[in-house]
Every structure is written in C-alpha cells, then in structure tokens.
Amino acid sequence: MPGNNTGYAKGVYGIGVRQDLFPGETEFFRKNPHVAGMAAEDNRIIMNPYSGLTDAEKQAVMLNEAARVHMRVGNFDTPRFTLTPEQEKAFAGYSTNPTDRLSTVAARILSNDPSALTPTPEQIEYVQRLRKFMGVK
C-alpha cells in the first residue's frame, strides 16, 4: 500500500483509510458506483465497495484522496493556480467551492487521472511540490 515507505506511520501517505462506511456513505456509493472513493468529512479516505476498480486503480484513487485531505486540512498550501477554460467547464458541477475544484484538479494531476485534462505549467509546478511533500515517487 502506498505510504508505507514514505516516513508516515500509517495510512496512505499519512491519511487514514476508514473501512467502515457510515449509512449515508453506503447508500451514496451504492447509487453512484462510478464514484471510486472520497476524502470523507472526517478526513479519512473511504472507498466505494460497489466500484469495479483494479487494485492499481484503487491505489491511484487513494493517492488522489490523500492529497485532497492534505490540502483540505492545511498540511499543504491551498492551490491558487488558474484552471483552463476546459477545466472550468469540466468541473463546473463538481462543487460550488472554487478551492474544491482546484484541489481535485491538483489531486487528479498527481494521480495521473486524465480527467484533470491538460495541466498548465503553473499546475504542474504546484503538483511537483505536492508530490515532494507527500513523498510520491
């Protein structure tokens, strides 16, 4: 599992994984099998037991969600880069909070998720710093 060789004591890159889902989370995941996992409100990573991801895909999702928690709780600076017009359009419905949109784009770039679309040099620089902070190779 990622995180075991980064200097963090537990979890995925220092963020805990919660196996037991709360009732609302279970229902959400059951209705949304396309949502692979999330950074839960308790700042733990939760995975969707109804998604059909491979182990490698699950690892990428956990990396993505760990990065989002680090940004959310202030362990790493909040992204302040600009989204491209294509990213603005693609993530317009993701959240009403602009920081959530920036954080998800950064985390998706970090985990090599193509849904982040084409990153700008500013986004790449931010993600390189995030990668170094998290100890991601």
Cite the ranges covered by each PLM segment.
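Active-site scaffold of zinc-dependent metalloenzymes
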Residues: 13-59, 66-72
